[in-house]
């Protein structure tokens, strides 16, 4: 059974610049929750079909593989695979008239393990931990967006 977790933030960037920051692998250590180091890039990142493999910090998710499934201007999605789960992570970039962009982050996932208590474990622990991780990622992403906005000639709010 597929499950979903969502989180959102607003950044002082255009959708194009917000997407550019989101897909900049050199910036991932500063905002992706649990990101340890990049292990491998296959293909032309961030184009459809490209794959990155990264390792988490100690005690984290282990090795994570992300393959680009959607690289459109307003949405970026990857098929994710790691020891505990697999699914799709998507980021949507929705511009507003005042020059800010809402970033909606979503993970649709299935657990790889869990046995007979998988559903209960997901409800009580895993889903909350994933949501917290998405929220921490987006908080740090928004903090990274402020200097990026200044470089683009915008004043962060």
Regions picked out by a protein language model, each given a short descriptive name:
Residues 1-44, 157:
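Hydrophobic ligand-binding cavity/cleft-lining segments
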Residues 10, 68, 91-93:
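Short beta-strand element of the conserved SAM-dependent methyltransferase core
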Residues 13, 58-60, 109-113:
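Beta-strand elements of well-folded, non-transmembrane domains
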Residues 13-15, 72-73, 96-98:
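Short loop segments at secondary-structure junctions
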Residues 30, 39-88, 102, 136-156:
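Glycine-rich portal/gate segments that line the openings of hydrophobic small-molecule binding cavities
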Residues 79-136, 152-154:
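Beta-strand/loop substructures that line and gate deep hydrophobic ligand-binding cavities in soluble
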């Amino acid at each position: 059974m597929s499950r979903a977790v969502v989180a959102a933030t607003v950044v002082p960037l255009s959708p194009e610049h917000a997407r550019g920051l989101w897909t900049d692998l050199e910036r991932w250590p500063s905002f992706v929750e649990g990101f340890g180091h990049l292990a491998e890039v296959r293909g032309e990142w961030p184009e459809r079909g490209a794959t990155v493999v990264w390792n988490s910090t100690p005690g984290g998710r282990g090795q994570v593989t992300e393959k680009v499934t959607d690289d459109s201007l307003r949405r970026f999605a990857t098929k994710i695979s790691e020891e505990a789960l697999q699914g799709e992570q998507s980021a949507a970039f929705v511009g507003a008239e005042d020059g800010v962009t809402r970033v909606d982050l979503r993970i649709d996932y299935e657990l790889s393990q869990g046995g007979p208590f998988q559903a209960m474990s997901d409800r009580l622990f895993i889903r909350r931990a994933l949501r917290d991780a998405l929220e921490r990622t987006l908080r740090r992403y928004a903090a990274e967006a402020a200097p990026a906005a200044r470089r683009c000639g915008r004043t962060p709010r």
